[in-house]
Amino acid sequence: MTGDHIKVIYFNGRGRAESIRMTLVAAGVNYEDERISFQDWPKIKPTIPGGRLPAVKITDNHGHVKWMVESLAIARYMAKKHHMMGGTEEEYYNVEKLIGQAEDLEHEYYKTLMKPEEEKQKIIKEILNGKVPVLLDIICESLKASTGKLAVGDKVTLADLVLIAVIDHVTDLDKEFLTGKYPEIHKHRENLLASSPRLAKYLSDRAATPF
């Protein structure tokens, strides 16, 4: 992919594109971050394969274009290309396991989107008192089982990036929800940022968005 121009296309938010962005950042890969307004989306939609975002457009040195769609498929592709899916079959399994656990948590978050405010607050209360703590406990057990300081060993993997993206969404629902609880999750983030100065800078510089 050396010399290719990579464009990540999504709305002005973290959402389903953030794991892709963070994978490229952690790998030290330059990319163009194109953010589309909801107002402009109807006219841009026909130009995107499948008419869904996020999408990645890769243009090689000869001008040949390759499109990639489906957020986790893209993130996995980029992570594998840059050796961020574990170094052994056992590590690969643990990476995928944690991605699955994080996605279970993400599904709870997505229940709150595009809802009227009163209904949204009701759903937030239900999930924060229901499945979210259970899923966070499961994730903490996986982090405890790691053989290193990060999600799977001591090298940054896609599991680390998917996890912190989802944890940020939990914090979006209630900024105090994680305070004083789930020490493994707090320690994981601390270790991850210490392990990847590029990622730490990206997160420090990242503008606040509603999703």
Swiss-Prot record:
Residues 88-211 form the GST C-terminal domain. GO terms for molecular function: glutathione transferase activity. One of its GO terms (biological process) is glutathione metabolic process. Residues 4-86 form the GST N-terminal domain. CDD domains: GST_C_Sigma_like, GST_N_Sigma_like. Keywords: Transferase. Glutathione binds at residues 10, 16, 41, 45, 53, 70-71, 104. It is an enzyme of class 2 (transferase). It catalyses: RX + glutathione = an S-substituted glutathione + a halide anion + H(+). It comes from the Eukaryota. Its EC number is 2.5.1.18. Conjugation of reduced glutathione to a wide number of exogenous and endogenous hydrophobic electrophiles. GST isoenzymes appear to play a central role in the parasite detoxification system. Other functions are also suspected including a role in increasing the solubility of haematin in the parasite gut. Homodimer. Belongs to the GST superfamily. Mu family. This is Glutathione S-transferase class-mu 28 kDa isozyme. It comes from Schistosoma haematobium (Blood fluke).
